[in-house]
């Protein structure tokens, strides 16, 4: 099924060329079903790249979705034109009185900062608090996962001895609906300087550890009801994303390590193998289906009329 987005969004042309079905308001309004409303808090610097990556996976689900993008008004993007943000993004003030079936919080390149030093931290905390009563399920990605854990539970991140960069094998708890249809292990890209410790999750939260890797440590956590999902990897990444990050850091004189298990024979001039797209598609599909669609209240405009709303509060 399609995703419903602004037909002028740059990602539309890319997705259409990949035979991914997108529709505009006119066509969607003639379908007599309620689409799921998904909000994406895009904290990544290359907004349009991340938009396309996220939308590619959301469009793979068998349900109609209406997508809105959110940005932090307390932060000014230095890499995306203001016109793009004003046209395709909403501020928190514009959405705070609405209800959403799902929220995706992306990563952000601010790991080197304490959470409180991030210029939009106060606004981020407001979004997390608001999501507890206005969003049915939230999927946090990479820094977004670390920040969500800190905001909700006080679980802090820890500096790693070297950047974790590459494609790694992780376990999958196939007994959990998020990993239904997965093999015992799957591959996913990781790109981060910090980590969350297993003992902190065990001691400070009631979250379940659903995926763990020898190299990655914690990979995916979730609450028992799947209203909170935390993924420390980047399953949404394109084939060449880690490559672009590597050459960017190399050009900046950071002397980066070659991403592990990525380039054939560690030859940076080889085209990287893509070995995670099927797992990524299944993960996003499972999140939409099992964490959102099958549980979310039907009448978000008047949630007091839906008994399931009171069941999860």
Swiss-Prot record:
- Which residues does the Swiss-Prot or TrEMBL record annotate as the active site? 142, 234, 236
Q: Give the metabolic or biological pathway.
A: Amino-acid biosynthesis; L-methionine biosynthesis via de novo pathway; O-acetyl-L-homoserine from L-homoserine: step 1/1
Q: Under which main EC class is this enzyme filed?
A: transferase
The organism's place on the tree of life at top rank: Bacteria
Q: Which UniProt keywords apply?
A: Acyltransferase, Amino-acid biosynthesis, Cytoplasm, Methionine biosynthesis, Transferase
The record's annotation in InterPro entries points to:
Class_I_gatase-like (IPR029062), HST_MetA (IPR005697), MetA_family (IPR033752)
Q: Name one GO biological process term.
A: L-methionine biosynthetic process from homoserine via O-succinyl-L-homoserine and cystathionine
Q: Which GO terms describe its molecular function?
A: homoserine O-acetyltransferase activity; homoserine O-succinyltransferase activity
Q: Gene3D superfamilies per the record?
A: 3.40.50.880
Q: Where in the cell is it found?
A: Cytoplasm
**Residues where substrate binds:** 163, 191, 248
GO CC field? cytoplasm
The reaction(s) catalysed by this protein are: L-homoserine + acetyl-CoA = O-acetyl-L-homoserine + CoA
Q: Where is this site: Important for acyl-CoA specificity?
A: 111
Q: What is its main location?
A: cytoplasm
At what residues does the UniProt record annotate the site feature described as Important for substrate specificity?
191
Give the E.C. number(s): 2.3.1.31
Protein task = Transfers an acetyl group from acetyl-CoA to L-homoserine, forming acetyl-L-homoserine.
Give the protein family: Belongs to the MetA family.
Spell out the PANTHER family in the cross-references.
Answer: HOMOSERINE O-SUCCINYLTRANSFERASE (PTHR20919:SF0)
Which HAMAP family would you find in this protein's record? MetA_acyltransf
Instruction: List the protein's name.
Output: Homoserine O-acetyltransferase
This protein's species is: Streptococcus gordonii (strain Challis / ATCC 35105 / BCRC 15272 / CH1 / DL1 / V288)
Q: Which gene encodes it?
A: metAA
């Amino acid at each position: 099924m399609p995703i419903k987005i602004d037909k002028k969004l740059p990602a539309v042309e890319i997705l259409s060329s990949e035979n991914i079905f997108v529709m505009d308001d006119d066509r969607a309004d003639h379908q007599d079903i309620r689409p799921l409303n998904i909000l994406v808090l895009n904290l990544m610097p290359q907004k349009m790249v991340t938009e396309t990556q996220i939308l590619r996976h959301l469009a793979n689900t068998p349900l109609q979705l209406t997508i809105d993008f959110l940005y932090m008004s307390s932060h000014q993007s230095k890499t995306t034109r203001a016109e793009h943000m004003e046209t395709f993004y909403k501020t928190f003030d514009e959405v705070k009185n609405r209800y959403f079936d799902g929220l995706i919080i992306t990563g952000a390149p601010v790991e080197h900062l304490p959470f409180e030093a991030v210029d939009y931290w106060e606004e981020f905390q407001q979004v997390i608090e608001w999501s507890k009563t206005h969003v049915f399920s939230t999927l946090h990605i990479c820094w977004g996962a670390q920040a969500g854990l800190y905001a909700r539970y006080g679980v802090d991140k820890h500096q790693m001895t070297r950047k974790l960069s590459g494609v790694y094998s992780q376990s999958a708890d196939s007994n959990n609906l998020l990993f239904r249809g997965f093999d015992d292990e799957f591959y996913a890209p990781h790109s981060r300087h910090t980590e969350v410790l297993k003992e902190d999750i065990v001691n400070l939260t009631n979250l379940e550890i659903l995926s763990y890797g020898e190299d990655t440590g914690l990979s995916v956590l979730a609450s028992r009801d799947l209203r909170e999902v935390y993924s420390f990897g980047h399953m949404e990444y394109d084939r060449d994303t880690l490559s672009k990050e590597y050459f960017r850091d190399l050009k900046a004189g950071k002397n980066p390590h070659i991403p592990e298990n990525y380039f054939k024979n560690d030859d940076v001039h080889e085209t990287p193998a893509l070995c995670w797209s099927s797992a990524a598609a299944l993960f996003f599909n499972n999140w939409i289906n099992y964490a959102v669609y099958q549980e979310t209240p039907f009448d978000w405009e008047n949630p007091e009329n839906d008994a399931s709303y009171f069941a999860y509060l």
